[in-house]
């Protein structure tokens, strides 16, 4: 526990942190990667270049300082970050490196004096221990469950299937022929790659897209413009190639009773965790209402449409609605979408009348903010809305 003086000293730095903003974490990362370049093998350098990770870390530091005397308020954020850390295989000793550079950053940018640095050192130590302990629990859970493993494990690509102009699915089975760990629908795999020509090892998280079967995994990858890893997977990864995987993780998952109605809302590749949820509901014969609401630019980039239709047909109470923002003439001729333009949930207001319905959202942050606001305006309780950000987390 932190003493009152330490808490007061840390909280007194909040105005300075807010005034500085993400410049603080930009300095921190630049310093850390200069002195410890080996960490470039772990961090997603694309998120460093676009600033997303720097903003996310700043928000986390500011939130910690603001809630330093109320750590339980931070536990949901801690769980989300700890789950993600396990896919990077973060180790306790790396927290010492981060702490060293965080304190050096505070000193170099603000010269706050030893009392402030000591207070932040104590505060960081408490938070680091929270993460270290939780991550140790997750590592142990992953290693001890049936089909589980420690560290990375070699998997072979056994199928590669284009699903749209932008999305391709990959089916993976363990090289050792053993069983694989189950997971909760909505969770992701950590994929580790360092093909020839890559300056650093790259680690990405891709949502699992079907119900666990104990034999292998399926992910789906969107080709991102300028995306080093996604383009390599689309252009160069082939059936028979071997990749390294970390056991499934993630705090975004569906866990509902059979009599709980569910609405799955997504756009683009945001449908990937929803597919695992829908597959799970379908194979369990879920008896309550299931809604599938999806938005795409047009039919060319709309993936898994046939699979969703087939899964929906196996559910006793299923409703699907698809929006195309800019449908082609071919899309109109085929009649493969329901509405044109942006997703407007107000036209489906009657679908949300059950107060026990659980809502799962995934897509770009702007889409989820837009959609969550519609749901709240329609009377849905915030606690019934669950969402996943691809990349560093942001609060809706």
Swiss-Prot record:
Binding site for heme b: 85
Annotated active site: 95 (charge relay system), 135 (charge relay system)
EC number in record: 1.14.12.17
FAD-binding FR-type domain residues: 150-255
Enzyme type, top EC level: oxidoreductase
Gene Ontology molecular-function annotations: FAD binding; heme binding; metal ion binding; nitric oxide dioxygenase NAD(P)H activity; oxygen binding; oxygen carrier activity
Keywords from the named record: Detoxification, FAD, Flavoprotein, Heme, Iron, Metal-binding, NAD, NADP, Oxidoreductase, Oxygen transport, Transport
Cofactors: heme b; FAD
Residues binding NADP(+): 268-273
Gene3D superfamilies given in the database record: Globins (1.10.490.10), Nucleotide-binding domain of ferredoxin-NADP reductase (FNR) module (3.40.50.80), Translation factors (2.40.30.10)
Globin domain ranges (all copies): 1-136
Residues that coordinate or bind FAD: 188, 204-207, 389-392
UniProt-annotated site: Influences the redox potential of the prosthetic heme and FAD groups, residues: 84, 388
Disulfide feature: none
Domain of life, source organism: Bacteria
Family according to the record: Belongs to the globin family. Two-domain flavohemoproteins subfamily.
HAMAP family found in the cross-reference section: Hmp
Entry text on domains: Consists of two distinct domains; an N-terminal heme-containing oxygen-binding domain and a C-terminal reductase domain with binding sites for FAD and NAD(P)H.
The protein, known as: Flavohemoprotein
Organism placement in taxonomy: Bacteria, Pseudomonadati, Pseudomonadota, Gammaproteobacteria, Enterobacterales
Gene: hmp
């Amino acid at each position: 526990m932190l003493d009152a003086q330490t808490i007061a000293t840390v909280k007194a730095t909040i105005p300075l942190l807010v005034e500085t903003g993400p410049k603080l974490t930009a300095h921190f990362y630049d310093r850390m990667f200069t002195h410890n370049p080996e960490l470039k093998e772990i961090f997603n350098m694309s998120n460093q270049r676009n600033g997303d990770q720097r903003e996310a870390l700043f928000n986390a530091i500011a939130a910690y300082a603001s809630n330093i005397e109320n750590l339980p308020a931070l536990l949901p954020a801690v769980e989300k970050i700890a789950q993600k850390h396990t896919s990077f295989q973060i180790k306790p000793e790396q927290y010492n490196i981060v702490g060293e550079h965080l304190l050096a950053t505070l000193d170099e940018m603000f010269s706050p004096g030893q009392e402030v640095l000591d207070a932040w050192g104590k505060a960081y130590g408490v938070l680091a221990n929270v993460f270290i302990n939780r991550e140790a629990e997750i590592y142990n859970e992953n290693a001890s469950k049936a089909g589980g493993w420690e560290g990375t494990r070699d998997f072979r690509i056994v199928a590669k299937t284009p699903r749209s102009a932008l999305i391709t699915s990959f089916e993976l089975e363990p090289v050792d022929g053993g069983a694989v760990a189950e997971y909760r629908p909505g969770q992701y795999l950590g994929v580790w790659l360092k093909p020839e020509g890559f300056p650093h090892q790259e680690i990405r998280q891709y949502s699992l897209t079907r119900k666990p079967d104990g034999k292998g995994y399926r992910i789906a990858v969107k080709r991102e413009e300028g995306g080093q890893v996604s383009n390599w997977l689309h252009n160069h990864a082939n059936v028979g190639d071997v990749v390294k995987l970390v056991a499934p993780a993630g705090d975004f998952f569906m866990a509902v009773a059979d009599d709980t109605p569910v609405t799955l809302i997504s756009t683009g590749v945001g449908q990937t965790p929803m597919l695992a949820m829908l597959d799970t509901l379908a194979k369990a014969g879920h008896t309550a209402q299931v809604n599938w609401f999806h938005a795409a630019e047009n039919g060319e980039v709309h993936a898994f449409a046939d699979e969703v239709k087939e899964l929906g047909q196996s559910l006793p109470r299923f409703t699907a609605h698809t929006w195309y923002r800019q449908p082609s003439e071919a899309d109109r001729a085929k009649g493969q979408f329901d509405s044109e333009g942006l997703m407007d949930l107000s036209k489906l207001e009657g679908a949300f009348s059950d107060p026990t319905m659980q809502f799962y959202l995934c897509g770009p942050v702007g889409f989820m903010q837009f959609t969550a606001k519609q749901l709240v305006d329609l009377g849905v309780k915030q606690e019934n809305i669950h969402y996943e950000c691809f990349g560093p987390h942001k609060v809706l």
